[in-house]
């Protein structure tokens, strides 16, 4: 793989902002996702490429790759590759310079400092200096984006941020498992 490769675990909407900045800054990036990714703002997320095989956010095209070789070929073409690899098994093979955990699960799903020379996690659930090298604060407010080298991000409150005066009432949770089929695009 490329020499200064950065692997980002997760391709949801918040992860996409990080990925986009890394790509625009000239880094080679490989995104790892689950087989059925979810995102709050699906149409602003590179994870849509898992479903669509190809997806564009602003001026960055993302394509689903089946192998590391195909992912590298996409990078050579200026295309952002995404692979289905929920457990991060490709990380050891790819030997990246850095791993960014942008899954935003509010807990550590296995990312650790042995994965790459430098590791970063977005949001709560990680301890900088132990689990990863750095944690980025994701809580709305004046600490948003702060890089933490010792300690952790603000714990998850479980309550959505206030938008237009509304907080938890703007989030709907399903009462049962199943599939939701969108019949209209929400842009």
Label every model-predicted segment.
Residues 2-187:
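Well-ordered secondary-structure scaffolds
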